[in-house]
Every structure is written in structure tokens, then in C-alpha cells.
A protein has these predicted regions:
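A short, terminal or domain-edge coil/loop segment
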Residues: 31-33, 120-132, 265-283
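A structural signal for short, well-ordered beta-strand segments and their strand-loop junctions
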Residues: 77, 125, 212-215
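Hydrophobic, Leu/Ile/Phe/Ala-enriched alpha-helical segments that form helix-helix packing faces
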Residues: 27, 43, 55-59, 112-120, ...
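C-terminal regulatory/effector modules of DNA-binding transcriptional regulators
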Residues: 170-335
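Non-membrane alpha-helical secondary structure
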Residues: 3, 50, 97, 101-104, ...
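Short, amphipathic alpha-helical interaction segments positioned at domain boundaries
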Residues: 80-107
Length: 335
């Protein structure tokens, strides 16, 4: 992780040491929140005068406020707009108050970034848009986006990659740069948020010849299901052309219509839910009715929807996300 010396200097101007400035840069860029164990492990120090001075600087500069979470001593929230402005991060929504689950996710993101400091992160929205649109020549319409209605202007604002999960290149100097996406599973038992995330990124995934995806969680309870879901929503669609997808959807839909539920897997049902929107409309309804009645051969569908098959290579990994802490520091904290 290479941090521009300009950013370090901007933070040192507030009275922070170089190490404190580096830590605050990472927090401001990736999370907005941190807990003591993360700073202690980053700085390689224990509780004492050094840490007390750091906390005092944060308070005297009014750069952070503390909030409490179950089983945490305290959570520090970087809230000073002037600090973000100095780093060119004023568009981040880190200054606002957030719900408990959001804070947990931001702390988990920081754990990952601190533990994987050697990769090259696409840190900001501009970095990500520039990489995909300028470097890879992908149109912006394929990027995951969200429209915000401003409180001070009637013009809506279109923002990209609002989830801000870590995205990085392991070797930015390689001839072919392969990007790694990630998703951090929250405390919820459902994988609906993960499915929604994959669907949001599906258009971008289709534009990439190769990419990696990390599914991160504190526990491994959902690993098998997450892998199955990724295979159904990402791997299979990218490995097949539109005709294959359409015929698979027709077969699943026919089984559902005939109440043959036992023949369908969870992956089939997820694929059906995604494909209903993709293959919606009168044309596809006409094709389905004709195919179901054996009036339309598969060869005709393949000739109609032959597409231009581009090979895609996807790499999926489910990984335990451990707290970033010195030995023993994470014990007793809610993660």
C-alpha cells in the first residue's frame, strides 16, 4: 500500500506523527471507524503514553468522536470534514452517524486492509472508475451505481461503487492486471445481501475476461452456500452464451410450472430469480410457450441467440476474516 507523501504531510500538519498519519489515512480512506486493537497492532505498541497522546490529539483536534458497541471498549469515528478535505476525501460519507451493522462492516473492512497492506488498492471512486473506464476501456454504464438526491440541489448525483468493499490489484505492473473484488458478510443469517451484491456487479463482471472474488466472513458457516451462489449467479452465466442461459431458464421454469419442485436445487431457484428479469418481455414469453409445447427446437433458439462468446475466467475464494490485532488483543472484543 503506497501512500502519497503529500497526504502524510497534510495529516502531520495537524500534529500527528508519521505513523499516526499513515494509520489515519488508511482509516479515513477505507473505513471511517477504528478500534484501539487496530492501531496498537499497526503501530506495534502496547497501551501506554504513546497511545494516550494519540487519543488526546484526536480529541483536541476534534477529529474523532467515540461511540460504544457491545463488547468493545470504544469505537473511534473520524468525523472532521477538514481532515477528509485535506486528503481529498470530502465526498466520502464517513462523517455521518451510522447504524451498528454498518459500523461492524467498516471495522471488518479495516481489518482486511491492514492485514493485506502489500496489495495495490483502488481506494477511491475516481480510482475505480478510472481503472475500468480509462485503463480497461469499459463503458461507465456497466459500473455498479446509485443515484442520490441532494439536500441542497435538485440535481441528482450518480455515484459508483458505493459499497466500498476492498478492491485491489496484486500486481499493478503486470501486463494483464487482474482485479480482485470482495464482499464482507455481515451478521445476518441470510445471503440475500450477497446475492444482491453479485447482481449489482453482474454487468461489470461480463466485461472482464478474468477477475478474482473474495467472500469474507468472521465464521465459515456460509462458505458452501456462498460458493454455490457465486457459481449460479456469476460463473455459470459467464461461462455460457445467451442461448445456453435461456434454455436453462426455460427448463427450470417448466419444472416449476409442473410443480416438480424436488428436481430443482437452490442454485436453480437463484438462477430462475435472476433470469426472470433478464428474460422478461413478450418475445421471451412467446419463445417459452412455443418451446414448452415442442413447437420450437433448441437449434432455432441457438441460432437466434448465438451471441459472441468471450471466455471468462473467474476465481472465487471464501476466507475467514480475522481481527487485525497483536497477540491476545482481540480477545473479549465483539468482532
Amino acid at each position: 500500500m503506497n501512500i502519497d507523501t503529500v497526504h502524510i504531510g497534510a495529516l502531520q500538519a495537524f500534529g500527528y506523527t508519521e505513523e499516526e498519519a499513515r494509520f489515519l489515512y488508511v482509516v479515513a480512506t477505507h473505513s471511517g471507524y477504528f478500534v484501539a486493537r487496530q492501531f496498537l497492532a499497526f503501530a506495534g505498541v502496547q497501551w501506554g503514553k504513546r497511545t494516550t497522546l494519540f487519543w488526546n490529539k484526536l480529541q483536541s483536534n476534534k477529529h474523532a468522536r467515540t461511540c460504544s458497541m457491545p463488547r468493545h471498549r470504544a469505537v473511534y469515528h473520524l468525523v472532521a470534514r477538514k481532515l477528509y478535505r485535506q486528503l481529498g476525501r470530502e465526498n466520502l460519507r464517513n462523517c455521518r452517524r451510522h447504524e451498528l451493522e454498518y459500523i461492524r462492516t467498516r471495522l471488518a473492512i479495516l481489518d482486511f486492509v491492514l492485514a493485506n497492506a502489500t496489495v495495490s488498492y483502488l481506494e477511491t471512486e475516481a480510482d475505480k472508475v478510472g481503472f475500468f473506464c480509462r485503463d480497461l476501456n469499459i463503458e461507465a454504464r456497466h459500473l455498479p451505481s446509485k443515484t442520490y438526491l441532494g439536500r441542497r440541489t435538485v440535481q441528482p448525483t450518480l455515484r459508483y461503487f458505493v459499497d466500498r468493499f476492498p478492491m485491489f490489484l496484486e500486481n499493478p505492473q503486470a501486463a494483464v492486471r487482474i482485479v480482485t473484488f470482495s464482499f464482507i458478510q455481515g451478521s445476518e443469517a441470510s445471503l440475500s445481501a450477497f446475492a444482491h451484491h453479485l447482481q449489482t456487479y453482474s454487468s461489470l463482471f461480463r466485461e472482464l475476461r478474468e477477475f478474482r472474488f473474495l467472500y469474507l466472513s468472521r465464521i465459515d458457516a456460509h462458505f458452501a452456500k456462498a460458493r454455490e451462489l457465486f457459481h449460479a449467479l456469476v460463473t455459470v452465466p459467464l461461462e455460457s452464451n445467451p442461448a445456453d442461459d435461456l434454455l436453462r431458464y426455460f427448463a427450470i421454469r417448466k419444472a416449476w410450472d409442473l410443480h416438480q419442485y424436488g428436481s430443482l436445487t437452490e442454485a436453480d431457484l437463484e438462477f430462475r430469480n435472476v433470469s426472470k428479469e433478464r428474460f422478461a418481455g413478450e418475445r421471451f414469453e412467446h419463445f417459452y410457450r412455443a418451446w414448452k409445447a415442442d413447437r420450437l427446437p433448441e437449434s432455432h433458439i441457438r441460432a437466434t441467440f448465438h451471441g459472441h462468446h468471450v471466455p471468462h475466467v473467474t476465481h472465487f475464494e471464501a476466507r475467514i476474516l480475522k481481527p487485525f490485532a497483536a497477540s491476545g488483543e482481540a480477545e473479549g472484543e465483539g468482532q
